C-alpha cells in the first residue's frame, strides 16, 4: 500500500519554510516546543471567543513564531484581519497581554504583528474551517466540497484535493469521500503544495477534513 507522508514536512527546505524560527539547547528544546504550542492555542482561543465571521470561521492561515533571547515576535497571517484590527484598536494589545500572561515571560518582550493574506480561500486552513462550518450546519458534504473548490478556483490555484472521513451524513458506517480538481502532484518535491488536516465535531461524531492545494511549481 502507498505510504503517505505529510506534504509539508516532505518539502521543508525546498518549497516550505518552518513556522517556528529559534534555537535552543537540546535539554531545553521541549520547553520551547511547549511554549510555541501555548502561544498558538492562546491566539486561536482568543480569536474563537472574540472574533467570529458569520460563517463561524477564525480566518487564521498560519502563525509564525520567531524567538531571540530578549524578544518573541509573532506574525499572524489572517485572511480577514479587519476583524481583529478595525473592530477595536485595543484588541491586539489585549491579545498580547493574554499571551504574555499565558507564557509568564518576565524578561522578554513580546510583539504581535498581523499580516493580511491576499487570497484567503487559497489557504487550506481557512477552506477547512469553511467546510467544517458547512458540515456543522448539516449541509450535504458534496455541496460543501464543491463550494470549497469553487472558492479555490477564484484564488488562482492550480489544483485542489479535498477529503472527508468519518460518519458522513450520519451514516452508520464510517467512510472516506474525496474530490480532486486540477493537478495535485504529491510526489514532486518542487511542487509548492499547501496541506492541512482539520477535525470537526458534528452531532453524528467526529469528521476529519484533509485539504491539499497545489499553489505553484518552483
Curated annotation (Swiss-Prot):
A GO cellular-component term linked to this record: cytosolic small ribosomal subunit
Domain of life from the UniProt record: Eukaryota
Domain KH type-2: 47-118
One BP term from GO: translation
Gene Ontology MF terms: rRNA binding; structural constituent of ribosome
Location relative to the cell: Plastid, Chloroplast
UniProtKB keywords: Chloroplast, Plastid, Ribonucleoprotein, Ribosomal protein, RNA-binding, rRNA-binding
Self-association state and partner proteins as the record states: Part of the 30S ribosomal subunit.
Family stated for the protein in its record: Belongs to the universal ribosomal protein uS3 family.
Matching NCBIfam families: rpsC_bact
PANTHER family: 30S/40S RIBOSOMAL PROTEIN S3, SMALL RIBOSOMAL SUBUNIT PROTEIN US3C
Protein name: Small ribosomal subunit protein uS3c
Organism for this UniProt entry: Arabis hirsuta
The gene coding this protein: rps3
Amino acid at each position: 500500500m502507498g505510504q503517505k507522508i505529510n506534504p509539508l514536512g516532505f518539502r521543508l527546505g525546498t518549497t516550505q519554510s518552518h513556522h517556528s524560527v529559534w534555537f535552543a539547547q537540546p535539554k531545553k528544546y521541549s520547553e520551547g516546543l511547549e511554549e510555541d504550542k501555548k502561544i498558538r492555542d492562546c491566539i486561536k482561543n482568543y480569536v474563537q471567543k472574540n472574533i467570529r465571521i458569520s460563517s463561524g470561521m477564525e480566518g487564521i492561515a498560519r502563525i509564525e513564531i520567531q524567538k531571540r533571547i530578549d524578544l518573541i515576535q509573532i506574525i499572524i497571517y489572517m485572511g480577514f484581519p479587519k476583524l481583529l484590527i478595525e473592530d477595536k484598536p485595543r484588541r491586539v494589545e489585549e491579545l498580547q497581554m493574554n499571551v504574555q500572561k499565558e507564557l509568564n515571560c518576565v524578561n522578554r518582550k513580546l510583539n504581535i504583528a498581523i499580516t493580511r493574506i491576499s487570497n484567503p480561500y487559497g489557504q487550506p486552513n481557512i477552506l477547512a474551517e469553511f467546510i467544517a462550518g458547512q458540515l456543522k450546519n448539516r449541509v450535504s458534504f458534496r455541496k460543501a466540497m464543491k463550494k470549497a473548490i469553487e472558492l479555490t478556483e477564484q484564488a488562482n490555484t492550480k489544483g485542489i484535493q479535498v477529503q472527508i472521513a468519518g460518519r458522513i451524513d450520519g451514516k452508520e458506517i464510517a467512510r472516506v469521500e474525496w474530490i480532486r480538481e486540477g493537478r495535485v502532484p504529491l510526489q514532486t518535491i518542487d511542487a509548492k503544495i499547501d496541506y492541512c488536516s482539520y477535525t470537526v465535531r458534528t452531532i453524528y461524531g467526529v469528521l476529519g477534513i484533509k485539504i491539499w492545494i497545489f499553489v505553484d511549481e518552483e
